[in-house]
Design a protein with these regions (language model features):
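Non-catalytic, solvent-exposed segments at the cell envelope interface
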Residues: 1-10, 14-298
Length: 298
């Protein structure tokens, strides 16, 4: 799911071949997607990011599992920094069970609870506090939208290295073509993986590569209307249409070098009978240093 979410972002910001073909359609879809939050600039910035000056910027990607009568939790939390001068994009996936201080509540809990307690704004502020960086923008996707996107693309191709069953589907070793529901199950499995959540992230990395390949194909261009409808229905962001255009024009070379960093030095602990993923302070400090460097916050 994480990588399906990231792929939606890259389809927006790195300029697939269909971008200019569907300029006006994207404008319409972006109006449906646009959902500002109650702040103009992060408390960790003095000034707003300037796309005209090609400032580095950051995005919090949220994959939300919302059910009827439930505010939902962010099953996916990814921080993305984009630096056009370095021609580099950095991705940090935050394990959903991470033990963290929840902004505005004065207590610690699983970091994915922040969204359930206070929506996008509290989720952003919680991650900002943990990583000591500003989060300039967010992109939120309904998990059901991930299914829709995969299906519109005609499925995704993966090479599976671990035979397992998940969500009622069997995934044998070898080359597979997955539809949306299968892809969700493929990316959610972690209990039977010897590498746990990090094994799941490896499968998710493969999903994004497949989605990006499909996203730049001729068949995708011909199905652009369906893709944009899926985006408009399932994706929300505080990025405006003009900002998306600026990113497409001036930042797409940042996708030339995509680096993933991780928080894999944590340990599994039970605190008051509840399972958490506890990350050492020195690990968080090291990640803070990397991300602040990418945002040129010295």
């Amino acid at each position: 799911v994480k990588w399906g979410l990231v792929s939606l972002v890259f389809l927006l910001v790195t300029g697939t071949g269909c971008f200019f073909v569907v300029y006006h359609s994207l404008h319409s879809a972006s109006k449906d997607m646009h959902s500002p939050i109650d702040r103009d600039v992060s408390a960790k910035r003095d000034d707003q990011v300037s796309f005209d000056e090609k400032d580095p910027f950051s995005v919090l990607l949220l994959g939300i599992d919302e059910r009827e009568g439930d505010a939902g939790r962010s099953d996916t939390m990814i921080v993305l920094t984009v630096n056009p001068d370095k021609k580099k994009t950095t991705l940090l996936s935050i394990p959903r069970d991470t033990y963290a201080e929840i902004s505005g509540r004065g207590d610690k809990n699983k970091i994915n609870h922040a969204y359930a307690y206070g929506g996008v704004k509290m989720a952003m502020e919680t991650v900002e506090h943990m990583l000591d960086i500003p989060l300039d923008y967010y992109i939120k996707v309904n998990m059901e939208g991930f299914e829709d996107m995969i299906d519109v693309l005609g499925g995704v191709k993966v090479t599976n290295s671990l035979a397992f069953e998940s969500g009622g589907y069997r995934f044998p070793v070898g080359d597979l073509v997955l539809n949306g529901k299968q892809a969700l199950s493929y990316t959610r499995m972690r209990q039977d993986d010897p590498d746990g959540d990090f094994g799941r992230q490896e499968r998710q990395r493969e999903i994004i590569q497949s989605v990006l390949r499909q996203g730049s194909s001729l068949s995708t261009i011909l199905n652009t209307g369906d893709i944009l409808q899926s985006l408009g229905e399932n994706v929300k962001t505080n990025l405006t249409f003009n900002q998306l255009i600026d990113i497409q024009n001036d930042y797409r070379q940042a996708a030339d070098h995509i680096e993933q960093i991780s928080l894999d030095a944590g340990t599994n602990k039970y605190i008051n009978g509840i399972y958490f993923y506890v990350i050492p302070e020195e690990t968080i400090a090291a990640v803070q240093k990397v991300l602040r460097g990418e945002l040129e916050l010295y």
